[in-house]
Amino acid sequence: MAKKGRGRSKGTFVAVLKNKAYFKRYQPKFKRRREGKTDYFARKRLCVQDKNKYNTPKYRLVVRVTNKDIIAQIAYARLQGDVIVTSAYAHELPRYGVSVGLTNYSAAYATGLLIGRRVLQKFGLDSMYEGQIEVDGDEFYEEADAAEKASFRCYLDTGLARTSTGARIFGVLKGCADAGIDIPHSPKRFPGFADGKLNAEAHKDHIFGGHVGDYMEKLEEENEEAYKRQFSRFIKNGINSENIEEMYKKAHAAIRADPSPKAKVEKTVDKKRWNRAKISYAQRRARVAQVKASFLRAQEAEE
């Protein structure tokens, strides 16, 4: 009968011996992994293209939500680094009539609609694929016409954000899909999805700011002082629970009318210099010659 080996048990904790061999063979993680900025497991699958699609980029819809802004970018990977095709930001929405609430779900949808129409315009596909003009909150997938070019396809890149149901990231996704972009997705993470099906009315309510309007009414009834403090910018801009939906409808129409980015105006700055400008080589030689000449004249005068 063979004897059992005296191997290490699976549940035993073994301290790492950090000797010379350990440090000699140690390989650090990628810098952005060490900083907790990039999930390389997910990034690899979002960037690697099919092997039968030669030199065809795999486009990603990169969405990042900050405290004061929502950032949406269409990007693809290259060895030199990611290339940004186009981008859209929630801080552009005041140009289309949405001056407040730039980080809520409704603003996320509008930002997605903006980048979707913008990238289609860039590739000359905006007239072929109009997307979902009448927003109803239900599922919508852009179907390619056999006689025409296929619509622009990209994949959602959420980064390290938590992909919970109703997250604003999926508002950008829905706006992009309704713009006419071919983006694979499921309705499971949209607001209003419960018990295996999507409540389109609840989702539409979020797209047009209905949930914000309901909270405004509730807070105004319960605590008017808190309402005036929390919605001071809404009150200043004349936005209330009754006209908030109309504001977003007008914004969607304005985005479809002109999604192109606003041209940057270069600022002319008058440069001020507080120290003496550096003189050129020719000026230095002339200055030395002048000093020498004055010295020689002084010597001759003394003689």
From Swiss-Prot:
Domain of life: Eukaryota
Listed InterPro entries: Rbsml_uL18_euk, Ribosomal_uL18_C_euk
CDD domains: Ribosomal_L18_L5e
Keyword Ribosomal protein: yes
Main localization, broad class: cytoplasm
Keyword terms, alphabetized: Cytoplasm, Nucleus, Ribonucleoprotein, Ribosomal protein, RNA-binding, rRNA-binding
GO molecular function, one term: structural constituent of ribosome
One GO process term, biological-process aspect: translation
Cellular compartments annotated: Cytoplasm; Nucleus
One cellular component term from this protein's GO annotations in UniProt: cytosolic large ribosomal subunit
Record flagged with keyword Cytoplasm: yes
Family: Belongs to the universal ribosomal protein uL18 family.
Function: Component of the ribosome, a large ribonucleoprotein complex responsible for the synthesis of proteins in the cell. The small ribosomal subunit (SSU) binds messenger RNAs (mRNAs) and translates the encoded message by selecting cognate aminoacyl-transfer RNA (tRNA) molecules. The large subunit (LSU) contains the ribosomal catalytic site termed the peptidyl transferase center (PTC), which catalyzes the formation of peptide bonds, thereby polymerizing the amino acids delivered by tRNAs into a polypeptide chain.
Subunit structure: Component of the large ribosomal subunit (LSU).
Protein name: Large ribosomal subunit protein uL18
Species per Swiss-Prot/TrEMBL record: Oikopleura dioica
Lineage, opening ranks: Eukaryota, Metazoa, Chordata, Tunicata, Appendicularia
Gene expressing this chain: RPL5
